[in-house]
């Protein structure tokens, strides 16, 4: 059984196959139930893009968890390595050469054999130093798509067709990302079994309402269940036989 825990804003913790994965670890966000220095046992940190609310506290968390790997699109990985170097004293070259920081790109999955995981970066429509992306995390219990920050795009249909994510984590806040209307369209394109809204309510400008998102998805009569998680709440799943 895998467990997905919402840590506020766009941050999630995924526990699957005995591994602990963090995505977009801005744990100093005002909604987070845990502080960066409290997180232990992390195996992998996935970062979708370089904005402060996604690159987040990667330096502090990686320093606290010396066994954790950090995975991102290459230029974003380079920025993450800078943050880790500040906290640990290791050079960027040392971090890359030791495999602690891994640069990748949009395309086929990155195979992490020692963790029993695959991660595929997918297109996202957003600004970033380096390329903004989404990420599909492929585990034995199921496939989780974290869309990162993005507007709705027809590439999402390809994400659904190729990776068939069981769970989709979608921004709904508007202004910088999709709003509930666009996010509901994204669900229609991706067709996951479960959709979980994120990236709303952290700041006044992120006006998207998760209940409106749920209503608009239900109006489309899709085979998708919307689960609204409060920060600190978890969703457990096992789609290994789905």
UniProtKB/Swiss-Prot annotation:
Keywords: Hydrolase. Pfam families: Lactamase_B_2. It comes from the Archaea. SUPFAM superfamilies: Metallo-hydrolase/oxidoreductase (SSF56281). One of its GO terms (molecular function) is hydrolase activity. Belongs to the UPF0173 family. PANTHER family: UPF0173 METAL-DEPENDENT HYDROLASE MJ1163 (PTHR43546:SF3), UPF0173 METAL-DEPENDENT HYDROLASE MJ1163-RELATED (PTHR43546). This is UPF0173 metal-dependent hydrolase APE_1117. The lineage of its organism: Archaea, Thermoproteota, Thermoprotei, Desulfurococcales, Desulfurococcaceae.
């Amino acid at each position: 059984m895998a467990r997905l825990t919402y840590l506020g804003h766009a941050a999630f913790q995924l526990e699957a196959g005995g591994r602990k994965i963090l995505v977009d670890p801005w744990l100093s966000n005002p909604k987070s139930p845990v502080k960066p220095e409290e997180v232990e046992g992390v195996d992998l940190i996935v970062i979708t893009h370089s904005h402060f609310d996604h690159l987040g506290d990667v330096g502090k968390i990686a320093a606290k968890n010396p066994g954790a790997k950090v995975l991102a699109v290459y230029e974003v990985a380079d920025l993450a390595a800078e943050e880790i170097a500040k906290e640990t004293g290791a050079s960027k070259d040392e971090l890359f050469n030791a495999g602690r920081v891994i640069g990748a790109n949009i395309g086929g999955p990155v195979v992490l054999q020692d963790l029993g995981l695959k991660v595929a970066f997918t297109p996202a429509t957003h600004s970033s130093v380096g390329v903004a992306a989404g990420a599909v995390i492929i585990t034995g219990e199921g496939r989780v798509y974290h869309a990162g920050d993005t507007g709705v795009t027809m590439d999402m249909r390809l994400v659904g067709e190729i990776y068939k994510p069981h769970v989709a984590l979608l921004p709904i806040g508007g202004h910088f990302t999709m709003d509930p209307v666009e996010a509901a369209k994204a669900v229609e394109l991706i067709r996951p079994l479960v959709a979980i809204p994120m990236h709303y309510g952290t700041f006044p400008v992120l006006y998207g309402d998760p209940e409106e998102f749920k209503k608009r998805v239900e109006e489309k009569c899709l085979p998708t269940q919307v689960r609204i998680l409060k920060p600190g709440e978890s969703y457990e799943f096992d789609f290994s036989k789905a």
